[in-house]
UniProtKB/Swiss-Prot annotation:
InterPro entries: Fe/S_biogenesis_protein_NfuA, FeS_biogenesis, FSCA_dom_sf, HesB-like_dom_sf, NIF_FeS_clus_asmbl_NifU_C. This is Fe/S biogenesis protein NfuA. GO terms for molecular function: 4 iron, 4 sulfur cluster binding; iron ion binding. [4Fe-4S] cluster binds at C155, C158. It comes from Pseudomonas syringae pv. tomato (strain ATCC BAA-871 / DC3000).
Length: 197
């Protein structure tokens, strides 16, 4: 069973909205865009019969069906959909505390593990300089996995980017991901207008 809670108030509010659609069997679909990243957004959309995806999980509610996106399901653990009334009318809220938490382990694909460490360990440090690094690709060269990275923000054009790449980023990633052999920077560092150093 999916660990998402739809309160009675939210159920009644959504049931009223769905009834106004004049579409027999219409329900809702709950999903997260970019789950497991800092950009994760939890969404609820109308779901007409046949619009659900094969991997979706159906939750039969009192007045309608809620379809939970299969890929988002783990990120929706402990999520709560609620409706709170106020003097302006009311507001539907979705609290999904695990939406931005990456779900990776030693068996996860290498690109997911690289992104996880970039988001949780590398980028928080680079953010203090207004910078970030993103994974462009993982390429195999001479039977070795190389992470192709690109700097942005204050790191692009920074005179310390090469030191950061080798001493910080590469060292951290190689410690955490044994099958990774190195990193390569594909940033155009001639663009220096936002550079930290």
């Amino acid at each position: 069973m999916t660990a998402i809670t739809i309160t009675d108030a939210a159920h009644d509010y959504l049931a009223d909205l769905l009834e106004k659609q004049n579409t027999p069997g219409i329900g809702i679909r709950v999903f997260i865009t970019q789950p497991g990243t800092q950009y994760a957004e939890t969404c609820i959309a109308y779901c007409k019969p046949g619009e659900e995806k094969p991997e979706d999980k159906a939750i039969g509610l009192k007045s309608f069906t809620a379809w939970i996106d299969g890929f988002s399901e783990a990120f929706l653990d402990d999520a709560v959909v609620d409706y709170a009334t106020d003097r302006m009318g009311g507001q539907l809220t979705i609290k999904a505390p695990n939406a931005k938490v990456p779900m990776v382990n030693a068996d996860s694909p290498i690109n997911e593990r690289i992104n996880y460490y970039l988001q949780t360990e590398i980028n928080p440090g680079l953010a203090s300089h207004g910078g970030q690094v993103t994974l462009i690709d993982v390429v195999e060269e001479e039977a070795k996995n190389i992470a192709v990275l690109q700097f942005g923000g204050g790191c692009q054009g920074c005179g310390q980017a090469d030191v950061t790449l080798k001493e910080g980023i590469e060292r951290t990633l190689l410690e955490r991901i044994p099958e990774l052999s190195g990193v390569r920077d594909v940033t155009d560092h001639t663009q220096k207008e936002n550079a930290y150093y």
